[in-house]
Amino acid sequence: MQGGKKAGESIKETATNIGASAKAGMEKTKATVQEKAERMTARDPVQKELATQKKEAKMNQAELDKQAARQHNTAAKQSATTAGHMGHGHHTTGTGTGTATYSTTGEYGQPMGAHQTSAMPGHGTGQPTGHVTEGVVGSHPIGTNRGPGGTATAHNTRAGGKPNDYGYGTGGT
């Protein structure tokens, strides 16, 4: 029975990954077409360069969204298959303690707090840092937001997504 569940979760993960890749491909194509249109109508070389930069930013965001969806799909598969291995009387608490395979610190290595932000055990325990306005996403020039270790970090503006978009949701009805 467990083998069938694992196979089903793998198929589901593969299907949602294909959907995420297709969506990213469409976003990249849209960015390229929009860039070409803007370059054709622009007379100033600066405007043409700006159109190219906008295209590259959109393409990078599409790739980041695809990678985030893949990570989400992998985590969902692991969560579903792990839940099947638990016997009666066992449960997870979601306390956030133990070994983490993901970052448990906020920007620049600051702890993010002890509030669980996901219903799935082991999926982060952080809160946003700084002032947060509901429904507003901050804007940062690409490559200037440096995270721990000097690596560039990205913000997935589509986290959670729309229920009917590819790569998101539980797969149920």
UniProtKB/Swiss-Prot annotation:
Residues 92-106 have a biased composition (Low complexity). InterPro entries: LEA_1. It comes from the Eukaryota. GO terms for biological process: embryo development ending in seed dormancy. Residues 1-12, 25-68 have a biased composition (Basic and acidic residues). Residues 70-79 have a biased composition (Polar residues). GO terms for molecular function: disaccharide binding; oligosaccharide binding; phosphatidylcholine binding. Pfam families: LEA_1 (PF03760). Residues 1-173 are annotated as: Disordered. Belongs to the LEA type 1 family. This is 18 kDa seed maturation protein. The lineage of its organism: Eukaryota, Viridiplantae, Streptophyta, Embryophyta, Tracheophyta.
